[in-house]
UniProtKB/Swiss-Prot annotation:
One of its GO terms (biological process) is glutamyl-tRNA aminoacylation. This is Glutamate--tRNA ligase. Its main location: cytoplasm. HAMAP family: Glu_tRNA_synth_type1. Catalyzes the attachment of glutamate to tRNA(Glu) in a two-step reaction: glutamate is first activated by ATP to form Glu-AMP and then transferred to the acceptor end of tRNA(Glu). It is found in: Cytoplasm. GO terms for molecular function: ATP binding; glutamate-tRNA ligase activity; tRNA binding; zinc ion binding. It comes from Citrifermentans bemidjiense (strain ATCC BAA-1014 / DSM 16622 / JCM 12645 / Bem) (Geobacter bemidjiensis). A motif ('KMSKS' region) lies at residues 238-242. Keywords: Aminoacyl-tRNA synthetase, ATP-binding, Cytoplasm, Ligase, Nucleotide-binding, Protein biosynthesis. It holds the Pfam family Anticodon_2. Transmembrane segments: none annotated. Belongs to the class-I aminoacyl-tRNA synthetase family. Glutamate--tRNA ligase type 1 subfamily.
Length: 467
């Protein structure tokens, strides 16, 4: 059995969007599962719209998702001489021809066909003209498609799909300026790169019969095709910017983890029983193109958020700490060296944080020298007895050998018993003094992470400011 070869072939006219990322993921997974090759090809024949900035954004997005490639990136713009060579081969074989019809003439033909209730398609005016010198007139090159019979393929997702050849146009494969067209270069690239399986969006279904006819005319193997249903917004319209962020990297900047995005994207159309949580390693073992559904997937931001919260909650604190640094810098924390160890801080927050933004916001107070105190909390939890309670607590904390959460909890119990009070009469005031907020990580965990010295400083600052 020959090696499977799959490719992802984005156009560099923008960022890596969610739909493109899912297509790349499906191709990558099948290549990895079948121990094949995953090829990255940049389809930049639209020179006017293609930018290096977009190329960089696509590569960055794939790298962030963990989708490495075995070959490439290849650029179609490097292959214009090759495409020209194949155009000339088809003309010489009588399988393509020069068409001299002007845009105005074609528009007249189109309007006539519509008026007569027919399907607008080229009427073949130049199909059988002698293919000698073109005497300087502008022309396009058209593929001479068969006019009879049926073109079909067994789609790996959608099943058998067929088109009557009489319905297909004589496809333009080279424009008047000599540049090749999309449907033609895709076939040449896939053929010369030995691509065996093409997984792409189902907006390409109508291109497929035309491309199959080109493969056959070139006498090269036709790959297998799998057309993935599109992704819809909540209103069941095609996912677009009006539904929110569609760029993969925008989700990174919003505090989503790559493993959450990968997990979510693969479940947009693919299933494996009732399982919801998959690592990339799991997916390589379990993924199959046959289990991709035929119905469109609806993008659900809440489900993505749920997955992200799961991965933060169960993530390695050291890794999360490294990912957190850029978000802290955005919030003015440029150096965490003077504060508590960041992985320890993460441990106190990851249980509740849904995004890295929430994690960063929650971590901020650990590294602030001057806190802003919640006014309602101060009015509710600070009173004339508070200074004595806070100082009494600190004195007892100082007598503990090692500040562990268990030891700290014991100190609070001892203080409450000694003063004849409940935890609710001292705990909220301590929380406010240490974090400035009525909502924070657990009090015992906070004290353990801040350490005795910093805890004492914060208690005294709060007493000085609030009592």
């Amino acid at each position: 059995m020959s090696q499977v070869r799959l490719r992802f072939a984005p156009s560099p006219t923008g960022y890596l969007h969610v739909g493109g990322a899912r297509t790349a993921l499906f191709n990558w997974l099948l290549a990895r599962k079948q121990q094949g090759k995953f090829i990255l090809r940049i389809e930049d024949t639209d020179v006017a719209r293609s930018t290096q900035e977009s190329v960089d954004a696509i590569l960055e997005g794939m790298t962030w998702l963990g989708l490495d490639w075995d070959e490439g990136p290849f650029y179609q713009s490097d292959n214009f001489p090759l495409y020209k060579e194949y155009v000339e081969k088809l003309i010489a074989a009588g399988k393509a021809y020069k068409c001299y019809c002007s845009a105005e003439e074609l528009e007249v033909k189109r309007e006539k066909a519509l008026k007569e209730g027919g399907k607008p398609k080229y009427d073949g005016t130049c199909r059988n003209l002698p293919q000698g010198a073109d005497d300087g007139r502008p022309y396009v090159v058209r593929f001479k498609a068969p006019q009879e019979g049926t073109t079909y393929w067994n789609d790996l997702i959608k099943g058998k799909i067929s088109f009557e050849n009489a319905e297909l146009d004589d496809l333009i494969i080279q424009r008047t300026d000599g540049t090749p067209t999309y449907n033609f270069v895709v076939v040449i690239d896939d053929a010369t790169m030995g691509v065996t399986t093409v997984i792409r969006g189902d907006d390409h279904v109508n291109n497929t019969p035309r491309q199959i006819l080109l493969y056959e005319a070139l006498e090269v193997p036709v790959p297998q095709f799998a057309h993935v249903p599109m992704i819809l917004g909540a209103d069941k319209a095609r996912l677009s910017k009006r539904h929110g962020a569609t760029s993969v990297m925008a989700y990174r900047d919003m505090g989503f983890l790559p493993e959450a995005m990968v997990n979510y994207l693969v479940r947009l159309g693919w299933s494996y029983g009732d399982e919801e949580i998959f690592s990339l390693e799991d997916l390589v073992q379990k993924f199959s193109i046959e289990n991709v559904g035929r119905s469109a997937g609806v993008f659900n931001p809440d489900k993505l958020l749920w997955l992200n919260a799961h991965y933060i909650k169960n993530g390695d604190p050291v890794r999360l700490a490294g990912l957190l640094i850029p978000f802290l810098k955005e919030r003015g924390v440029t150096d965490t060296a003077g504060g508590p160890e960041l992985p320890a801080v993460v441990k106190t927050l990851q249980e509740r944080a849904k995004t890295m933004l929430e994690l960063a916001d929650g971590a901020l107070f650990y590294y602030q020298q001057e806190l802003s105190y919640d006014e309602k909390g101060v009015a509710k939890f600070f009173n004339p007895e508070t200074p004595a309670l806070l100082r009494g607590l600190f004195k007892k904390l100082g007598a503990v050998g090692e500040l562990t959460t268990v030891a700290i909890e014991g100190v609070f119990k001892e203080l409450c018993e000694e003063k004849g009070i409940k935890l609710g009469q001292v705990g909220p005031a301590v929380r406010l003094a240490l974090s400035g907020s009525t909502a924070s990580p657990g009090i015992y965990e906070m004290i353990e992470v801040l350490g005795l010295e910093e805890t004492g400083k914060r208690l005294e600052r709060a007493i000085a400011k609030l009592c």
